[in-house]
């Protein structure tokens, strides 16, 4: 047995009892003939005291920062110590000695730039701030799944090696598939639509890939996509579902991630339901009134979104009813005005974190939409053929996990948030 208790589980009530801790040497200090070890495990930090006359003192002299040790000792309640207790070591076992000096200071006393942090990533991830990010992400995914399970959704897994582009775009990574050209999936879009035509309500959490040329704090070549598709629904239905999901995610993190938020010194924004809905045409008018030369059909970029954020005075808002020509072929146009689509983006301040729409569920409409986009319907026959056999009206959305984490942690770069980011410059670690 390597440990009897995690550090955070030992309280002053354990005074006088023997416990075994295991973890990493976070900090070392010599003071008045005693050795103080700040030990770290997944639950936090704890103080170990090694007296000079202890049999453990000799080995404590060999320890380096980030060495992995096991400590058997007696708990002593002490209000001055972290968590109100310290462990007086009777035996220390060195399980793995770390090289010295470290290429990156895990304690955070010496700051490192982002390139150093990404190069020495595993040490960087051991920092308390990064462990807090990892734990908050886990809580977000837990709340996402729990909300959808309660709403009757089924978790699915779709192919990640595909024959053609999901949206007809050029940002594809080609792979050789048994002598044929195939691609890494940009999105589970087409397959999740087909699955909505099977079990009605589906979701997936999985990686997706885009040959992303943009070198910004918010773009990656590989990312985790949180996808939802819902039969017998339109874009208003899935926006309401998304509001519920986000509300539950933030609530879960505030309730179960208090320590992590404290470490990050951050509080996620409240999700006020209903989230404000701004029509695309209204957004264009606001931007024109601010001197922007923007015309119908233009995208709304980051500078423009910053202006909208200032004007609306809302951290979270939907931009709805985008021009049909600006959306993918599977997006349904509004019946009363085909120039507009039943679509939405959810914006956090100036960052798009979710995109969704009502989908086209009739084959002939899809074929026309493909042709209009300059795509060949025959290239999508694997998808279109199933619309001959009763495809229900449906709607859905995709949410980028790393971008959602910007909102949940306050960290302004997805490259810092993702444990091992992939962009144009990085393929390792």
UniProtKB/Swiss-Prot annotation:
Q: Name the Gene Ontology molecular function terms of this record.
A: aspartate-tRNA ligase activity; aspartate-tRNA(Asn) ligase activity; ATP binding; magnesium ion binding; RNA binding
- Cite the EC number: 6.1.1.23
SUPFAM superfamilies membership: Class II aaRS and biotin synthetases, Nucleic acid-binding proteins
**Comment on bound cofactor:** Binds 3 Mg(2+) cations per subunit. The strongest magnesium site (Mg1) is bound to the beta- and gamma-phosphates of ATP and four water molecules complete its coordination sphere.
The UniProt annotation places Mg(2+) 2 binding at: 352, 355
The principal localisation class reads cytoplasm
Localization terms from the record? Cytoplasm
Q: Where is this site: Important for tRNA non-discrimination?
A: 82
- List UniProt keywords, sorted A-Z: Aminoacyl-tRNA synthetase, ATP-binding, Cytoplasm, Ligase, Magnesium, Metal-binding, Nucleotide-binding, Protein biosynthesis
The record's region (Aspartate) falls at 189-192
Q: Which residues bind L-aspartate?
A: 167, 210, 355, 359
Residues given in the record as Mg(2+) 3 binding sites = 352
> A GO term (biological process) for this protein?
aspartyl-tRNA aminoacylation
Q: Which residues bind ATP?
A: 210-212, 352, 400-403
Q: Which InterPro entries match?
A: Aa-tRNA-synt_II (IPR004364), aa-tRNA-synth_II (IPR006195), aa-tRNA-synth_II/BPL/LPL (IPR045864), Asp-tRNA_synthase_2 (IPR004523), Asp/Asn-tRNA-synth_IIb (IPR002312), NA-bd_OB-fold (IPR012340), NA-bd_OB_tRNA (IPR004365)
Cofactors named for this entry: Mg(2+)
Its EC top class is: ligase
Can you cite an annotated GO cellular component? cytosol
Q: Catalytic activity annotated for this protein?
A: tRNA(Asx) + L-aspartate + ATP = L-aspartyl-tRNA(Asx) + AMP + diphosphate
Entry-linked Pfam families: tRNA-synt_2 (PF00152), tRNA_anti-codon (PF01336)
> What job does the chain carry out?
Aspartyl-tRNA synthetase with relaxed tRNA specificity since it is able to aspartylate not only its cognate tRNA(Asp) but also tRNA(Asn). Reaction proceeds in two steps: L-aspartate is first activated by ATP to form Asp-AMP and then transferred to the acceptor end of tRNA(Asp/Asn).
Family statement: Belongs to the class-II aminoacyl-tRNA synthetase family. Type 2 subfamily.
Subunit arrangement?
A: Homodimer.
Name of this chain's protein: Aspartate--tRNA(Asp/Asn) ligase
Gene assigned in the entry: aspS
